[in-house]
Amino acid sequence: DIEKMAVDYLSTLKPVEKNENYDPIRHGPPILREMSDERRATLIRQNPDYGIIICRCEEVSKGEILDALRSPIPVPTVDGIKKRVRPGMGRCQGGFCSPLVTQIIAEYLDCPLEEVRKSSEQAVITYGKTK
């Protein structure tokens, strides 16, 4: 059984204890465009980042982008965020929101804009400031 094999292997690396509060159903991050106005208002009161719409075409908020960056398997590229949360998938194809997504990634990673990549280490978005 896979569970026993995983526990046996992991216990060789570090102590493994049973989590009595384990929930086998993964509850994903909130998706604003699928919420009622009441639920959306509640979420924005709890975290104002959900009230900052970054992608108007797909109704993606700053909070949703930050959720993707903070996830257990983070996506620190513009295309990774696009695939996970959908900014840039709408009519404008990222013409308006891609610079904002890039800025949010740079702020979150605490790095200059020049270090944020489109999809891989070789996919440079900006080489430097022009002004």
What feature does the model see in each segment?
Residues 1-91, 95-131:
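Helix-rich C-terminal "cap"/substrate-channel and partner-interaction subdomain
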